[in-house]
Amino acid sequence: MSEIVVPRQFRGPPFTANGGYICGVLANAVGGRGVAMLRSGVPLDVAVTLQPGEEGAILLTNAESAVLGSARPADDSQIPSPPPAPPSVEEARAFAAASQFAQRSLHRGCFSCC
């Protein structure tokens, strides 16, 4: 078991940690390729606990032992091989221009929601 505290700089939606950041923490705790799932918002600047689950899984729990997220080792069938090709710069710009969120952020101050 180990405690982590997500610093405010990794904020996602108001008062919670960025989901991508937390999924990365969970997958890293599995010790290799993993499949992560969030179940609830992870608070900022509050200790939460990473603890072992069944069959190599990792659980992220709060002080009340509620499971906030989990990760488990991924088998090869869950990982595309080869991975999908990234979009071209032109494709990414076209998508951004067409997005309803291109000019505004849903969550101001979010680590990656810009």
Walk through the language-model features, giving the residues of each:
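Non-catalytic linker/capping segments at the edges of enzyme domains
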Residues: 1-3, 63-65, 72-114
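Active-site helix/loop of acyl-thioester processing domains in fatty-acid/polyketide metabolism
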Residues: 2, 9, 13-35
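Surface-exposed beta-strand edges and their flanking turn/coil or helix-capping segments
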Residues: 17-20, 49-51, 82-85
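General N-terminal targeting signals
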Residues: 21-23, 51-53, 75-77
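Generic hydrophobic segment detector
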Residues: 30-41, 109-114
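Hydrophobic beta-sheet segments that form the core/acyl-binding groove
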Residues: 34-70
